[in-house]
């Protein structure tokens, strides 16, 4: 099982192999974390995203990370464009992100709180689902998972989920 860390921080500045992006199925990065990642990465991220879109709910694909310290951005579809999300989608998107990270040979991965911004999903439930998915997924190459969240409530929710016995 990988080491799990929880931090309040800017996911675009983390020195990890891969950064996860909570995306829509069209891979349009218009708001929230997706927009911040698109701004920090490079123009190639948008063109690579357009080439790979659309993807299904819960699926994940990678692009280059451009000017960010990470090597890859893994875009996980947590909702339709502008639509809500669900527990099943968040869990599937987390598992898909982990599978892509493994395929890429990433040793470290930064995850954001899937579905809790534009998707409107409760942070504590997202934390429980995502930490549970990390613990149960058969990881081989990924040794470190960092949950990069915004705000005290999110940090507390993810820290509590990570502290629970597996």
Task: Describe each model-derived feature in a short phrase.
Residues 81-166:
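Phosphate/ribose-phosphate-bearing ligand recognition and processing surfaces
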Residues 1-104:
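Glycine-/small-residue-enriched capping loops at alpha/beta junctions
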